[in-house]
C-alpha cells in the first residue's frame, strides 16, 4: 500500500515491516561466520524479536533458511556484508561519540528505533541515558518482548512513543532529554522514508535540540539512489524470495536537499564515508559494480556541532 499523509503501521506492515526485515538480517548475520572464526555480528536479541513478530518469511531469513546465493541482484554474501557494515558502522559511531570529549556525551537518541537493540547490547558508559523514539505500538512491542525474556537494558533507557511527524521534540524533552547537554543521535535507515520537506524539518529539530559537542550519524543518499530504480529492483528481489514488502511504495523518491548540505548550512561539520570505504573499513571487498551503478556515491554521513 502506498504511503499517505498520517499513515500508521505495525511491525508486520508498511514501514514497520522494513524494521522487521533489518532485524531478520541482523539475526542471520549473528549466526553466520561467512568463513571466518566468529559470527559477523553479535546481536543476541534480533532473532527473539523477529520470532515474536511472527512473519514466516522474516523468521526464515533470520534462521538462514532461504537460499539467496544465486540472486542476480543481491546474493547472500552481499546481504550479509551490507547488514554487517551498516550495523557495525552505527555501533562504532556510538562508541566513538561516548569516548570523545570534553564535553562528554552521556545522552543518546535513536530516531525511528524500531527493533534496534543497542540500548540492550552496547557497553554504554555509566550514567548514559538512551532515548528511543518510534510509534507507540512499536515501542511497546519491543519493550514487552525483551522484558518477558528477562533482557535488561545496558543503559538507562527512556522510550518516547510518538510519530516523528508529530511534535516529537516536546515529547522528548518531556521524557527528560536535556538540550543543553551534548547528544549522540542516529537516524539509521530513516531519511529515505521521509518526504523531502519532512527530512529537512527533522534535521532542523535535531539541530535545535543539539548543544555544542553533539554528533549525528545517518545515511548519505546519492541522487541516483532516489530515482526509484533501486526500490523497484529490491522489491523484485524480495518477491523472488517470498516477501510482499513493496519498497517502491514506501520510499520517497525524487529531488531533495542532501542531508549533508542541509546540516552544513546549519553549522554542522560533516563527513561522508563512501560505501566502498565503509566496506573496506570492516574488512570486506568493495561494493559490486552493478550495485554501485544503482546507488552511486551513497554511504554514511556523520556530523559534529561545535
From Swiss-Prot:
Its EC number is 2.1.1.-. InterPro entries: Ppm1/Ppm2/Tcmp (IPR007213), SAM-dependent_MTases_sf (IPR029063), SAM_mthyl_Trfase_ML2640-like (IPR011610). It is an enzyme of class 2 (transferase). Keywords: Methyltransferase, S-adenosyl-L-methionine, Transferase. One of its GO terms (biological process) is methylation. The keyword Transferase applies. It comes from the Bacteria. GO terms for molecular function: methyltransferase activity. The keyword S-adenosyl-L-methionine applies. Pfam families: LCM (PF04072). PANTHER family: S-ADENOSYL-L-METHIONINE-DEPENDENT METHYLTRANSFERASE YKTD-RELATED, S-ADENOSYL-L-METHIONINE-DEPENDENT METHYLTRANSFERASES SUPERFAMILY PROTEIN. Exhibits S-adenosyl-L-methionine-dependent methyltransferase activity. Belongs to the UPF0677 family. This is Putative S-adenosyl-L-methionine-dependent methyltransferase Mvan_1345. It comes from Mycolicibacterium vanbaalenii (strain DSM 7251 / JCM 13017 / BCRC 16820 / KCTC 9966 / NRRL B-24157 / PYR-1).
Amino acid at each position: 500500500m502506498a504511503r499517505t499523509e498520517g499513515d500508521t503501521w505495525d511491525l508486520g506492515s508498511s514501514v514497520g515491516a522494513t524494521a522487521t526485515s533489518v532485524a531478520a538480517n541482523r539475526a542471520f548475520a549473528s549466526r553466520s561466520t561467512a568463513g571466518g572464526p566468529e559470527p559477523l555480528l553479535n546481536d543476541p536479541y534480533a532473532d527473539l524479536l523477529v520470532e515474536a513478530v511472527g512473519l514466516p518469511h522474516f523468521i526464515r531469513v533470520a534462521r538462514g533458511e532461504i537460499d539467496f546465493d544465486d540472486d542476480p541482484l543481491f546474493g547472500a554474501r552481499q546481504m550479509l556484508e551490507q547488514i554487517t557494515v551498516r550495523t557495525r558502522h552505527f555501533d562504532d559511531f556510538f562508541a566513538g561519540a561516548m569516548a570523545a570529549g570534553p564535553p562528554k556525551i552521556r545522552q543518546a537518541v535513536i530516531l525511528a528505533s524500531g527493533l534496534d537493540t543497542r540500548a540492550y547490547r552496547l557497553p554504554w558508559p555509566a550514567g548514559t541515558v538512551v532515548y528511543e523514539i518510534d510509534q507507540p505500538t512499536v515501542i511497546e512491542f519491543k519493550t514487552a518482548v525483551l522484558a518477558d525474556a528477562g533482557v535488561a537494558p545496558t543503559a538507562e533507557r527512556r522510550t518516547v512513543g510518538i510519530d516523528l511527524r508529530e511534535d516529537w521534540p516536546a515529547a522528548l524533552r518531556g521524557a527528560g532529554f536535556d538540550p543543553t547537554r551534548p547528544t549522540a543521535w542516529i537516524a539509521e535507515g530513516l531519511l529515505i522514508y521521509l518526504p523531502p520537506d519532512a527530512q529537512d524539518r527533522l534535521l532542523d529539530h535535531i539541530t535545535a535540540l543539539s548543544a555544542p559537542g553533539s554528533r549525528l550519524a545517518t545515511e548519505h543518499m546519492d541522487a541516483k539512489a532516489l530515482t526509484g530504480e533501486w526500490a523497484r529492483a529490491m522489491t523484485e528481489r524480495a518477491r523472488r524470495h517470498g516477501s510482499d514488502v513493496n519498497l517502491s511504495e514506501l520510499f520517497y523518491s525524487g529531488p531533495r536537499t542532501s542531508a549533508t548540505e542541509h546540516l552544513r548550512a546549519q553549522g554542522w561539520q560533516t563527513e561522508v564515508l563512501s560505501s566502498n570505504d565503509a566496506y573496506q573499513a570492516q574488512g570486506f571487498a568493495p561494493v559490486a559494480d552493478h550495485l554501485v551503478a544503482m546507488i552511486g556515491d551513497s554511504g554514511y554521513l556523520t556530523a559534529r556541532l561545535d
